[in-house]
């Protein structure tokens, strides 16, 4: 037994095996959650429209996700004439891989992260910023004006709302004094940041809707204008990778909102019935509740026009988040609450 322990923890191969198992422990449940998020979304939208939704494949339609996956696997990947084949295939892979590796620093419990690094918040911000490249490459490589227009919209939209997201993160970091996501959650042991910083939480979540190209900010793939945007020429598994990446990014925005504002794995109150529930269960429940809000918004809020989207990002969210950041810094300084940076 000690020999196995020495092999796993004292050799490079053993550490590689442990890291791979940790990654699988995150990715396999994430893929299942993404698959069933599509079914749950269709159920929610059906309920909003007074319909039943998927109810044929399996009991209550619960196997619909596997039917959709089988359909995608059996379809043919068609590459348009004039498209750059290498970049055309690279774009969905890049989008999917970036959506997956972002989860490396997300702690679902105290210390439960594949990579518990001290710059976790900065890492997530960097990965979310890189996501736009997959969309731009897809739009350019498809050799389609609809795809290219969608890619241009995506670039402008993501850059616009990343600024507000950055200011929100800086405000949180002023309160915590650390870029480590584990420290951010533990700093909310007594009061979740959503209470003193409610406007910033709202800005962060709405900016997350725009960052993931979800309704009401889905002008990147506006069906009534540019068909499916940057994905218009994609089919089969290449399209499925974009789809999986989009839903994984939605889960990431919900996870970031949970970690930054809703106390991560911490219960609402540190009392006996609530702290019996394991931390990962609280984390998953909060993420699923925020995912429901994503679906609810899609079923109830109409799509913004492009000019309305830009105006909201640059003329409302940006100045408000900057003012709130300065206000937070002033309050922390005057009250003597600025944390000591290690």
Swiss-Prot record:
It is found in: Cell inner membrane. GO terms for molecular function: NADH dehydrogenase activity; oxidoreductase activity, acting on NAD(P)H, quinone or similar compound as acceptor; quinone binding. It holds the Pfam family NADHdh. The chain crosses the membrane at residues 15-35, 86-106, 119-139, 159-179, 190-210, 251-271, 277-297, 316-336. PROSITE patterns: COMPLEX1_ND1_2. GO terms for cellular component: plasma membrane. InterPro entries: NADH_UbQ_OxRdtase_su1/FPO, NADH_UbQ_OxRdtase_su1_CS. It catalyses: a quinone + NADH + 5 H(+)(in) = a quinol + NAD(+) + 4 H(+)(out). It is a multi-pass membrane protein. Keywords: Cell inner membrane, Cell membrane, Membrane, NAD, Quinone, Translocase, Transmembrane, Transmembrane helix, Ubiquinone. Coiled coil: none annotated. One of its GO terms (biological process) is aerobic respiration. It is an enzyme of class 7 (translocase). Its EC number is 7.1.1.-. NDH-1 shuttles electrons from NADH, via FMN and iron-sulfur (Fe-S) centers, to quinones in the respiratory chain. The immediate electron acceptor for the enzyme in this species is believed to be ubiquinone. Couples the redox reaction to proton translocation (for every two electrons transferred, four hydrogen ions are translocated across the cytoplasmic membrane), and thus conserves the redox energy in a proton gradient. This subunit may bind ubiquinone. HAMAP family: NDH1_NuoH. NDH-1 is composed of 14 different subunits. Subunits NuoA, H, J, K, L, M, N constitute the membrane sector of the complex. Belongs to the complex I subunit 1 family. This is NADH-quinone oxidoreductase subunit H. It comes from Granulibacter bethesdensis (strain ATCC BAA-1260 / CGDNIH1). The gene is nuoH.
């Amino acid at each position: 037994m000690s020999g196995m322990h020495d092999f796993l923890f004292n050799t490079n191969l053993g550490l590689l095996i442990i890291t791979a198992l940790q990654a699988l422990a995150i990715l396999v449940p994430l893929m299942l959650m993404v698959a069933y998020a599509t079914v749950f979304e269709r159920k929610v939208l059906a309920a909003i429209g007074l319909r039943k939704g998927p109810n044929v494949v399996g009991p209550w339609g619960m196997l619909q996700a596997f039917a959709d996956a089988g359909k995608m696997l059996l379809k043919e990947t068609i590459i348009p004439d004039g498209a750059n084949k290498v970049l055309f295939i690279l774009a969905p892979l890049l989008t999917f891989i970036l959506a997956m590796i972002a989860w490396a620093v997300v702690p679902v419990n105290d210390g439960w992260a594949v990579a518990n690094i001290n710059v976790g918040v900065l890492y997530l911000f960097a990965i979310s910023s890189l996501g736009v490249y997959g969309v731009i490459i897809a739009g350019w490589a498809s050799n389609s004006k609809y795809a290219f227009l969608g890619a241009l919209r995506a670039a402008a939209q993501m850059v616009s709302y990343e600024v507000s997201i950055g200011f929100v993160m800086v405000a949180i970091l002023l309160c915590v004094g650390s870029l480590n996501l584990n420290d951010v959650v533990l700093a909310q042991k007594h009061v979740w940041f959503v209470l003193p910083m409610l406007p910033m939480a709202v800005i962060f979540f709405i900016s997350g809707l725009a960052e993931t190209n979800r309704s009401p900010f889905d002008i990147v793939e506006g069906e009534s204008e540019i068909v499916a945007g940057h994905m218009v020429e994609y089919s089969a598994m290449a399209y499925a990778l974009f789809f999986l990446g989009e839903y994984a990014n939605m889960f990431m925005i919900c996870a970031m909102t949970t970690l930054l504002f809703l106390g991560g794995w911490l219960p609402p109150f540190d009392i006996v019935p609530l702290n019996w529930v394991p931390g990962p269960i609280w984390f998953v429940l909060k993420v699923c509740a925020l995912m429901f809000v994503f679906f609810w918004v899609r079923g109830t809020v109409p799509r913004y026009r492009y000019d309305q989207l830009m105006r909201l990002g640059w003329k409302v969210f940006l100045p408000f988040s900057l003012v709130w950041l300065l206000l937070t810094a002033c309050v922390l300084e005057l009250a003597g609450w600025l944390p000591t940076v290690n």
